[in-house]
Regions:
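Low-complexity or membrane-interfacial segments used for flexible interactions
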Residues: 1-35, 41-46, 75-161
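Short, well-structured hydrophobic secondary-structure segments
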Residues: 35-65
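Helix-adjacent hinge/juxtasegments
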Residues: 57-85
Length: 161
């Protein structure tokens, strides 16, 4: 899978999630608000993203009803490692190991790789920042996990592995 930056304007940014030659989802971020609109085969959703914390920053995602769905936390700013909590489950991630531009998501014990996703098409802005929370990385990661781990997307999760 890979994220592709489609359009970056003054008022919005649009990204697409691709698996091979098939578009899986489209997400558009409003630069004026903290909301994002997601369109996928699962329907249309609106998520809100909040940055929290000072010494240990994290990004929290809430659904359209304001209910917390999950969060991303970076182990150390600039480390490219951290954890994702989504629907009560914990996952660990490593981003850009060996300058690959790819993210690998593991189970809680780091025994099994659950998915790999390329951020090469959107990582120009990621390389210029000290923390992964200075850009849309955490939001894209949360949407990627949400999409992949939908209960009715078992075939999508198997295709990713």
């Amino acid at each position: 899978m890979k994220w592709v930056s489609v359009n970056t304007g003054a008022s919005y940014e649009i990204f697409e999630l691709w698996n091979g030659d098939r578009k899986l989802a489209n997400i558009s971020f409003s630069n004026r608000t903290r909301f994002a609109r997601i369109v996928s085969s699962f329907g249309k959703r609106i998520f809100s993203f909040e940055k929290r914390g000072f010494l240990l920053p994290k990004e929290v995602v809430k659904n359209e009803y304001g209910i917390k769905m999950g969060e991303v936390e970076e182990s150390r700013p600039g480390s490219g490692k951290g954890q994702v909590m989504l629907d009560g489950k914990k996952y660990l991630f490593i981003y850009d190991e060996n300058n690959s531009g790819e993210l690998v998501l593991y189970d809680e014990l780091m025994q099994k790789s659950l998915l790999t996703c390329s951020f090469n098409m959107v990582n120009k802005g990621l390389m210029k920042t000290r923390s992964l929370f200075d850009n849309k990385f955490a939001s894209l990661l949360l949407v990627l996990c949400w999409y992949t781990f939908q209960p009715h997307s078992a075939s999508a999760a198997k295709a990713v592995s």
